[in-house]
Each structure stands twice: as structure tokens, then as C-alpha cells.
């Protein structure tokens, strides 16, 4: 079944110009078309249509893979009263008894939080087997990291760098992997400034390998 994802504005990445009322058609795990909604819908009249508010962009790469998944603990919701809801690092992490099973569960929760920020891949070497397994099961891609990222680790790939540097790969051409995200930010002005100002926490949908893996309710 082919699905068209349409948004108020599409930023294809790379050298592509913004497309007001843009859309991406997805067949299986691959992109079938990218462009104005009217053209994409005319080419695929039988497709199911999902409409999203805001800006549709390429999927994001978080540069802090090891820091967020192997050097931080993401508490289970059942531990919230004791540990809170935010990732634990430093002395708070050192005080925990961390088994392989606990690292794996933490990484799964961390990966889900990444998906909720439009992330489709992480950069940096992951060395814990339980963490690698969790990342693989969730479906996040893994990218090589050639230098240490600047600034504190963040779940927001837009934080501390130009928005376009967070994009993993430009959208398209036909046959490319269907990895993208949608952010509910204003589209009346500079969309890049809006993404930086409001951040990846505004993500309303993440598509990874053609699957809708996150949808904000």
C-alpha cells in the first residue's frame, strides 16, 4: 500500500528548495516520489494520504550516540518517583547497579525518545552488546563519527549546530530510503530559524524505513 505524507512545507535537504504544500510518497521502505502534493497525488491517485502540520524534513542524525545510550540511564516510567524522568549521568548513574539487561532496557527507552525527536540514526561507536542490540531492534541507523561533537549531549539534534547539519540524507530520489520527520513549527517565516527556535521536541511524526515509528498524540 502506497502512502503519501503531506505537510504545510517540505524541506528536501541538500540543494533542494523548500516546497510549500510538499509531500513524500512511500512504497514499502522506499520513497516513491517527492514534490508538491498535487503532483505526487496525481501520480499516485490510489495512495492513502496522511496530513501533518508544520515542516517535513529529512530524518535526523543525533551525534551523541554513545553519550546518550551508553553513558546515560533512561529511567523506566515505574522508577519515576525515585529517579525522575530525565536521563541520569555522572554520580547519579554511578550509584545505579547497571547490568547488561538494564543497559539494554535503558537504550530501548532512549532510542524511543530519539524517535520522538525525529532521529533516524545516531553517530559514534556503540560498544555495549546490549545497547547495540537495542538500537538494531528499534531500527536506528548507525553513522561513523570523525570528531567529538561540541556542546553538551542532547536528545535534540538541532541543538548547538546549523539545522541542515542534523539532516541525515536529502529526501529522494525515487528508490531512496524513506526516512523523514515532521515538526509542528510555524511556516510563515524562515523554516530553518523556526526549527532551531522550537527544537526537535516539536516532532509530530517520524518515518523510518517507511514505517511510522513515532506519532505524537
Regions found by a protein language model. Give the residues of each.
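Alpha-helix-centered segments that form part of catalytic cores
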Residues: 94-116
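Long, charge-dense
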Residues: 79-83, 87, 97, 144-161
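Active-site loop-helix segments enriched in His/Asp/Glu that coordinate
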Residues: 117-156
Amino acid at each position: 500500500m502506497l502512502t503519501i505524507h503531506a505537510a504545510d512545507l517540505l524541506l528536501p535537504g541538500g540543494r533542494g528548495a523548500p516546497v510549500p504544500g510538499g509531500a513524500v510518497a512511500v512504497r514499502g521502505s522506499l520513497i516513491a516520489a517527492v514534490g508538491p502534493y498535487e503532483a505526487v497525488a496525481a501520480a499516485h491517485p490510489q495512495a492513502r494520504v496522511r496530513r501533518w502540520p508544520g515542516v517535513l524534513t529529512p530524518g535526523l542524525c543525533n551525534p551523541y550516540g554513545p553519550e546518550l545510550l551508553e553513558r546515560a540511564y533512561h529511567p523506566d516510567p515505574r522508577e519515576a518517583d525515585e529517579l525522575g524522568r530525565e536521563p541520569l549521568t555522572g554520580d547519579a548513574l554511578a550509584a545505579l547497579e547497571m547490568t547488561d539487561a538494564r543497559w539494554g532496557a535503558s537504550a530501548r527507552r532512549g532510542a524511543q525518545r530519539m524517535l520522538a525527536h525525529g532521529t533516524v540514526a545516531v553517530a559514534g561507536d556503540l560498544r555495549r552488546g546490549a545497547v547495540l542490540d537495542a538500537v538494531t531492534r528499534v531500527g536506528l541507523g548507525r553513522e561513523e563519527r570523525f570528531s567529538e561533537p561540541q556542546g553538551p549531549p542532547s536528545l535534540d539534534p538541532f541543538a548547538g549546530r546549523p539545522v541542515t547539519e542534523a539532516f541525515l540524507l536529502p529526501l529522494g530520489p525515487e528508490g531512496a530510503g524513506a526516512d523523514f520527520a515532521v515538526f509542528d513549527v510555524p511556516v510563515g517565516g524562515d523554516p530553518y530559524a523556526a526549527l532551531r527556535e522550537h527544537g526537535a521536541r516539536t516532532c509530530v511524526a517520524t518515518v523510518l524505513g517507511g514505517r511510522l515509528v513515532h506519532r505524537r498524540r
